[in-house]
């Protein structure tokens, strides 16, 4: 029986490349001349450091554009609240890895509500979809892509 897995992962190499490109762009931008601002990548999260909160917003936009250039979906970003220590502002941006249980339940409910003849089961941080016809599986892929679940999804381990 054909099956595939729905996963949500961000490639660490592409993420690091996007952060490096964003740091390079910061050093060349006119509005960041003479300003201490940087992106620090560590363990699937990026720490933004700047002197003003509006610069943090600009830095998030720079990071988003560089992620898009590297084919990393910016919807995987989850920005924490900005905090100020002295003259500098800090903000941590975490990248979602894996599908959380409540999002996985929404995916399974979305598939079952659409009455496609497939079975969806939650297996850890991924959702396995099994069906008799390849066309049904492709319909589920289109359904999950169109569903607004606040997280990017990839399809892996397609078996015929």
Swiss-Prot record:
Domain of life, per lineage: Bacteria
Signal peptide: none
Keywords, in A-Z order: Nucleotide-binding
Matches recorded under NCBIfam families: PRK05412.1
Classification via CDD domains: YajQ_like (cd11740)
Classification via Pfam families: DUF520
Gene Ontology molecular function terms on file: nucleotide binding
Assigned GO CC terms: cytosol
Protein name: Nucleotide-binding protein VS_1405
Species assigned in the record: Vibrio atlanticus (strain LGP32)
InterPro entries membership: DUF520, UPF0234-like_C, UPF0234_N, YajQ-like_sf
Cysteines joined through disulfide linkages: none
UniProt record similarity statement: Belongs to the YajQ family.
The protein's role, per its UniProt record: Nucleotide-binding protein.
